[in-house]
């Protein structure tokens, strides 16, 4: 290779180097500009990082503060939960005690042996009373039949009238011979005739008063007494239905067959109350009427005094019957083995807290209102 070629090659290499140098300088300028821009971006980023770190610090402090407050709230809540747990345990103990008392009361309520014994005793007493009333009914029927039989009195009146006619005929035969005596005798006979007429009128008035007033008054008194018996029967049936409904609601089933049979046996006894009421009236009535009949046969002038005695007997007998029924009701409604609730008036084997809760009361409020000595069980009555 010649020198010229070397020189040309070096010139070409110098030109290429110059171009490369220019390109490198251009690139260096661009790189410096990019470095400057990146430095500016880094500065901005550093500032942003600083601000973000400050915000993070504030946020961390806020989270720490919130954590402390939350921990305090949790501690307070745990304390409340512990207190509520103690209250719940106390309530649980109270409910368990109440459940024991309630189970005892239910067992007492379900024990109706005493009630069945009382019902059996009542049935026996009512059967005996039924027999007594039947005997009174027979006596009353016999007395009424005796009072209605006045054939002997009518026969005596007929005999008396025939005797009066015979005497009058005898005096007429002697009239011609003994005018003066006959006139006097006629006057005496006329007076006696007037007396007989007055006696007959008094007897007719008494008979009319007895059959129209006394007997009707007696029948009305009997009807009133039968009406009272019917009202009492209706009240008894209403009370029986209420008791059956209460027993069904309380025990959750109907009354047993044995109790139903007891009630069925009690109904015929009540149905015979009308006959028994008539039997109660009969002795006094029969005595008064028989006394009046004897006074008619012996002393006609005292006929009117017998009526008031007969008139007063049915009412007195009815009052005695009502007093007897009232005493029997009192004895039935106040059994010895039960105690009365002062609020509702019903009888129970014991006045318990669950029952008083139905009246919006407690045992202490019940004692405050009706006294500390108010009985809660049958043993407390003594």
UniProtKB/Swiss-Prot annotation:
Biotech use: Can be used for presentation of peptidyl epitopes in the mammalian immune system. Modification of this protein to include a 6 residue epitope elicts strong antibody responses without the injection of extra adjuvant. An insert carrying 168 amino acids of gag from simian immunodeficiency virus in this protein evoked a long-lived immune response and immunologic memory (IgG) in the absence of additional adjuvant when injected into mice, suggesting it has the potential to be used for vaccine production.
Family annotation (Pfam families): Halo_GVPC (PF05465), ROS_MUCR (PF05443)
GO molecular function, one term: DNA binding
Signal peptide: none
Region feature 7 X approximate tandem repeats, mapped onto this chain: 22-284
Family matches, as InterPro entries: Gas-vesicle_GvpC_halobac (IPR008639), ROS/MUCR_sf (IPR041920), ROS_MUCR (IPR008807)
Note: Encoded in a 14-gene plasmid locus called p-vac which produces predominantly short, spindle-shaped gas vesicles during all stages of growth.
Name of the molecule in the record: Gas vesicle protein C1
Gene that encodes the chain: gvpC1
